[in-house]
From Swiss-Prot:
DNA-binding region per Swiss-Prot/TrEMBL record: 207-226
Miscellaneous section: As bacterial aggregation is one of the initial steps of biofilm formation, the clumping phenotype observed in the vjbR mutant suggests that B.melitensis might be able to form biofilms.
Annotated segments matching region C12-HSL binding: 76-179
Signal peptide residues on this chain, from the entry's feature table: none
Entry protein name: HTH-type quorum sensing-dependent transcriptional regulator VjbR
Organism: Brucella melitensis biotype 1 (strain ATCC 23456 / CCUG 17765 / NCTC 10094 / 16M)
Keywords: Activator, DNA-binding, Quorum sensing, Repressor, Transcription, Transcription regulation
Top-rank lineage group of the source organism: Bacteria
Observed effect of gene inactivation: Cells show down-regulated expression of both virB operon and flagellar genes either during culture in bacteriological medium or during intracellular infection. They also show no flgE or fliC production between the end of the latent phase of growth and the beginning of the exponential phase. The vjbR mutant is also strongly attenuated in a mouse model of infection, probably because it is defective in intracellular survival. When cultures reach high density, cells aggregate and form clumps.
One GO term of the biological process aspect: quorum sensing
Domain HTH luxR-type span(s) in chain numbering: 183-248
């Protein structure tokens, strides 16, 4: 097994390929500014730029965490207990998708994980850690952890409100790190109406609302989205939207509709 580590400490440049570095850092900074997260970590089983190997033994980790925390994480060997890196983590399984999970659920059943999250909070990473699954059209899975500082809003309500957005953003990050380059061939499979439906779905519209906007029947919208799922090799609507976003088939939506 090999480990590729891409580190942008506190959203600053690092030693890595200039093109990948510039584009990815700009994306991560934009995501931070749009959703108000503190830090982003993305993990997937594969090598940087390889979007073809399913269940690879290799590991790529992309992060914006402070260098001081990364050093502490290493010295404490938190890797061994971090729920995102466990063999049975649900984010990488072939039979699961569209997961957005508050890691407090893991902390509630494992004291070691609770200690890890408490230590991370003490060091300024935030008090809410949300792990979000992602999968590219070839079936390669990944997981993004977004950290937030949430004080006034209930954690469950916050997660429910942000879930569609986080799933989309995790898909975009995953596609960027995997280096999927077949967007044109995938896009050519989709009809204009299928793309329209995906675009409005990304903006949080229901099937009925999309039907009204496009002046078509609701069942026609359902059919278009079902066809798009099949063409994008996705198991559900949320995953199809995230994949379309990650490949640049549709543009990233504004966040206002989730507020």
């Amino acid at each position: 097994m090999s480990l590729d580590l891409v580190h942008f400490p506190n959203y600053k440049k690092t030693f890595f390929g200039s093109s990948f570095q510039s584009d990815t850092l700009a994306l991560l900074t934009r995501i931070r500014d749009e959703i108000g997260c503190r830090y982003v970590t993305h993990t997937y089983r594969g090598r940087v730029g390889d979007c073809t190997k399913v269940n690879s033994a290799d590991l790529t980790v992309l992060m914006t965490l402070p260098a001081t925390w990364v050093a502490r994480y290493s010295s404490k060997n938190y890797f061994a207990i971090d729920p995102v890196f466990q063999e049975d983590a649900p984010y990488y399984r072939n039979d699961t998708s569209a997961i957005a999970r508050d890691l407090k659920e893991d902390a509630d059943i494992c004291p070691a994980v609770a200690e890890l999250l408490h230590d991370a909070e003490k060091h300024g990473l935030g008090n809410l850690f949300i792990a979000v699954s992602a999968r590219n059209p070839k079936g390669v899975a990944g997981c993004t952890v977004f950290t937030f500082e949430v004080e006034d809003e209930d954690r469950t309500q916050f997660l429910a409100r942000m879930r569609p957005r986080l799933l989309s953003l995790a898909g975009i990050i995953h596609g960027t790190v995997c280096g999927c380059k077949d967007a044109n061939s995938v896009a050519s499979l989709l009809t204009p109406r299928e793309v329209d439906c995906l675009r409005w779905a990304a903006n949080g519209k229901t099937d009925g609302e999309i039907a009204e906007i496009l002046s078509i029947a609701r069942w026609t919208v359902v059919t278009y989205l079902q066809n798009a799922k099949i063409k994008l090799n996705c198991s559900n609507r949320t995953s199809a939207v995230a994949t379309a976003l990650s490949l640049g088939i549709i543009d990233m939506p504004e966040v206002q509709h989730l507020v």
